[in-house]
Amino acid sequence: MSTETTTGNSSLIPASSSSSSSDAIDPAPLLFNGDDNEGNNGGGGGERRSVRRQGLREAARFLSRASSGRVMREPSMLVREAAAEQLEERQSDWAYSKPVVVLDIVWNLAFVSVATAILVMSRKEHPIMPLRVWLLGYALQCVLHMVCVCVEYRRRNRRRTNRTTTTTPPRSRSSSSSSSSSSLEEEALGSRRNSGVQDLSLGHLDTESSSVAKHLESANTMFSFIWWIIGFYWVSAGGQELAQESPRIYWLSIVFLGFDVFFVVFCVALACVIGIAVCCCLPCIIAVLYAVADQEGASKEDIEQLTKFKFRKLGDANKHTNDEAQGTTEGIMTECGTDSPIEHTLLQEDAECCICLSAYEDGTELRELPCGHHFHCSCVDKWLYINATCPLCKYNILKSSNLDREEV
């Protein structure tokens, strides 16, 4: 039986990055580092997240800094930032799912239809303010938004289809001879080489179309803000005289302006609610994602291969002070399911789960990841099912499991 003393959840560094402690825990985790994200997530992943990073993470950062230092220590802040980033990624995926896209198109199409109908019905009205031009511009914005959404939706579907076809190579159903299997592998390799140029050209076209669509959507968003101010000024300047001379155009403009305000307030309130939930009720957020999201992380088999420990809390008489770590020993975590279990001594400040912020109770089952960080089994298992990375240092557990399989 071997015994080790851990110096903290935040001080354990993954084996792959032991040469630099700053790679495991960023001293300024709230500042965006584009190089790290590109290295961990591929070429375009960092750019995509850098645009969306301002939403939920701002609320999580504010609430984390506003909390006390005991409740929200640095490891807990890192875990909640990782959860907020995961929510942002899934929010983007959900925003371009088929039901949401259909609802968005139907909603904007209804605005265009109503605006067109009112403009036709009120052709005899003569408003003192150019609200006809404003309604026409509003309808054109809705049309441009629908076009951008359709282009982005098709691009994401095409990329998802290409990813599925490239990650699932053909397998032979029978292994009657080694020559037949090798010929199948050569044919599969040749087909992948032949389709490589086509995939590259399609990817280049997708990138260009996506860039144009994003620029149009950004310009449309900026123009809609300016257009809203212009419409509000014209409606306010017209007053009762405008309402009496052109009631249809006047009230339709009021409705459109009111809907825009409602959507802005709703989005801001939703971001604040999600930020509060990420900081205060992170296990609930993980449970919801675990229930509704598809498996994109580790499988149950990969999770079960991780080392499981059982925490044993020491009594007051058995607790002692560690001079090197300058802390009091809280308990011992013992490896489960082995004849020669490994034991880790946990200090008082490290005997808590960074996900749920609850202290380890006597007999609690813990899961230790390859990077050395440990959490409640019930907390981290659901997280790994959604995302196969450590919630604290973002170490990918599938890398270590694949290496172990190759060694075997």
UniProtKB/Swiss-Prot annotation:
InterPro entries: Znf_RING (IPR001841), Znf_RING/FYVE/PHD (IPR013083). Gene3D superfamilies: Zinc/RING finger domain, C3HC4 (zinc finger). GO terms for cellular component: membrane. Its EC number is 2.3.2.27. CDD domains: RING-H2_RNF6-like. Pfam families: zf-RING_2. A zinc finger (RING-type) spans 353-394. It comes from the Eukaryota. It is a multi-pass membrane protein. It is found in: Membrane. The chain crosses the membrane at residues 100-120, 133-153, 219-239, 254-274, 275-295. It is an enzyme of class 2 (transferase). GO terms for biological process: protein ubiquitination. The keyword Iron does not apply. Signal peptide: none annotated. One of its GO terms (molecular function) is ubiquitin-protein transferase activity. Pathway: Protein modification; protein ubiquitination. Residues 10-34, 163-183 have a biased composition (Low complexity). Mediates E2-dependent protein ubiquitination in vitro. This is E3 ubiquitin-protein ligase At1g12760.
